[in-house]
Amino acid sequence: MNQYARTELLLGAEGMSRLHGARVALYGVGGVGGHAAEALVRSGVHQIDLYDNDTVSLTNLNRQLIATRSTIGMYKVDAMADRLRDIDPEVLVGAYRMFYMP
């Protein structure tokens, strides 16, 4: 059994394969983006690119998954990349310390 067995029951093998083959980019991994990144990887997305130039601060502790006393001062993309790899060691995470401005 693998960690995505329950998701595969819902999506089927073809759906799971499509999800596993998806590549997702998230711009901002704080409050909303952090929850989205974690949900995507827990669902089976295998490649994710994270863009954020901010660092974890004390004021993030009340609302952000990546914010703990041990991550204060870390770049948010690095803290999130560590967290996502802890959930699935095979996930491919691109962590980009930059703001995206269209």
Could you describe each region identified by the protein language model?
Residues 24, 65-68, 96:
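Conserved short-loop catalytic and cofactor-binding motifs
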Residues 92-94:
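Conserved beta-strand segments of alpha/beta enzyme cores
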Residues 1-25:
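N-terminal charged helix/coil linker that caps or initiates catalytic domains
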Residues 20-42, 47-52:
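Glycine-rich adenosine-cofactor-binding loop
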Residues 10-14, 37, 102:
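A generic local structural motif
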Residues 45-88:
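Glycine-rich phosphate-binding loop and adjoining beta1-alpha1-beta2 segment
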Residues 96-102:
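Conserved SAM/SAH-binding loop
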